[in-house]
Amino acid sequence: MKFTQRLSLRVRLTLIFLILASVTWLLSSFVAWKQTTDNVDELFDTQLMLFAKRLSTLDLNEINAADRMAQTPNKLKHGHVDDDALTFAIFTHDGRMVLNDGDNGEDIPYSYQREGFADGQLVGDKDQWRFVWMTSPDGKYRIVVGQEWEYREDMALAIVAGQLIPWLVALPVMLIIMMVLLGRELAPLNKLALALRMRDPDSEKPLNATGVPSEVRPLVESLNQLFARTHAMMVRERRFTSDAAHELRSPLTALKVQTEVAQLSDDDPQARKKALLQLHSGIDRATRLVDQLLTLSRLDSLDNLQDVAEIPLEDLLQSSVMDIYHTAQQAKIDVRLTLNVQGIKRTGQPLLLSLLVRNLLDNAVRYSPQGSVVDVTLNADNFIVRDNGPGVTPEALARIGERFYRPPGQTATGSGLGLSIVQRIAKLHGMNVEFGNAEQGGFEAKVSW
């Protein structure tokens, strides 16, 4: 098996064809030999019987054996006679030979018991013969006609060989033609392999499937789809890396400035304390940004969800509201949960769905003014998170969800990744996210299924 795996497709197909052709030829030879020998036996047995009947119609009382048993030449002017093809002898009932063909007939042993077809041997000869014994109508004579088995076998072999040897001779020609045709048919695959070797790693150009066999075309199409996905992923990763580097530069620069301020404030405890507090706040923002970057990177690499389960959405929303409640109270914001339906369940990854709801609530609390309310409403086919903030402009609304995008004029801290994470998690779960300005005022996010 390992040896055949190292062979080329052309060689393997040629070997398969050669093996199948050889097996077919052998089976055909066996079947032809069997049928031919049966037909030859039937034909010559009939010939023996007819010749014996013709001899039995002679006037055997008038036969002069001395005049008729002289040998005749086997080679004539325009042909050749095989002395094994046919022989005969005529005996009296007491076993005295009165006539034979002058060749092998004189060596046929007499048998007074046999009648019909029987196998036997000549006197002094080990070769097998086929005999037919018959008694004359008057009962005075015994007639025997014989033929050597080897003659029949040679005849059958000659017939079979005449039919099958031309096919055996044609087999090498067929192999050569097959290898040439395979080489021509596999040429598009060789071009395809060359194109793959010369291809740039980040190229999105699809492979040319012209001339490719239909059996291989799905592979080429799958490769083109893979190249497109790989290119899109590389573009996304490059943009992500560039945006991440840009977003991290500002908080890191701010941390450096606050560190320098703290170092220069040894004589002013109040200024030093303020600088350390701002440094701590900057570290928190940088930590949050890094966490969101890592989360988004992991989500981008996911194609299928693992460890999924049936999740009651009312329990998910209640636990998420309880998690954000303390932070909302510190910001003097009230969070209200309204369950218009009960028993709604969704199949998904619990941690990711919890992260989706938490990001929506965190975004609503972060951008809502003090004294406002964040409403969370569960319906039969969606849930809505709505705040009482100022909302966003139509221009900004069109870009909501883009990575690192924050509407202009925002005073609250943020990285612009929270809603991107929400969209990615929703897509993995087959959900749809819509952002818009609420009719009652404020910004709302609707997650539907």
From Swiss-Prot:
It comes from Escherichia coli O157:H7. Keywords: ATP-binding, Cell inner membrane, Cell membrane, Kinase, Membrane, Nucleotide-binding, Phosphoprotein, Transferase, Transmembrane, Transmembrane helix, Two-component regulatory system. The gene is qseC. This is Sensor protein QseC. It catalyses: ATP + protein L-histidine = ADP + protein N-phospho-L-histidine. Residues 243-449 form the Histidine kinase domain. Its main location: membrane. It comes from the Bacteria. The modification Phosphohistidine is found at residue 246. It is found in: Cell inner membrane. Its EC number is 2.7.13.3. It is a multi-pass membrane protein. The chain crosses the membrane at residues 13-33, 157-177.
